[in-house]
């Protein structure tokens, strides 16, 4: 895999308002279950599990799985995924991921970009970014906006992650096999 791939899934744009409504419901459920922050509580749930009755989320997961397996066709993989449901002043600052791979799906990205140390992604609805987890990145607001910035973050783990992060793995209820 090169540094990253960027895929645009038109289906998200075509059904954006319905997906936003379903993810708001999922966010409310996550909060009712005692997870106060859907981003930082990523080990406590999997957004595709919370939203499992949704046909739209099924299609997004199916496409995401295809993208990941096209890049990583062999071996055991696990995926954790969470909902970033953020206000203008709550976007993520510089960070990286301990997982082998990381990505995000732009549902309602507002006027933002994701800045990596060596490149920048213009966040557009329907974009699915996928790359190695160690690349440091942050979200930059390009202008003030009202409403929520909504993306789905995901990490893909390999056998290596399970050998290196044994303690962490047993505390992670959001990680599922990616068949």
Where are the regions that the model predicts?
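A short hydrophobic beta-strand segment most commonly corresponding to one strand
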Residues: 102-105, 145-162
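Short, cationic low-complexity segments
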Residues: 171-179
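Non-heme Fe(II)/2-oxoglutarate
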Residues: 1-74, 91, 177-178
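Conserved metal-binding segment of the jelly-roll/cupin
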Residues: 122-138
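A short beta-strand-loop-beta hairpin characteristic of the jelly-roll/cupin
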Residues: 107-124, 140
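Short beta-strand His + acidic residue motifs that chelate non-heme Fe in jelly-roll/DSBH
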Residues: 92-95, 136-145
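Short, conserved beta-strand element in jelly-roll/cupin
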Residues: 85-86, 96-112, 155
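A short glycine-rich, His/Asp/Glu-containing loop-to-beta-strand
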Residues: 70-85
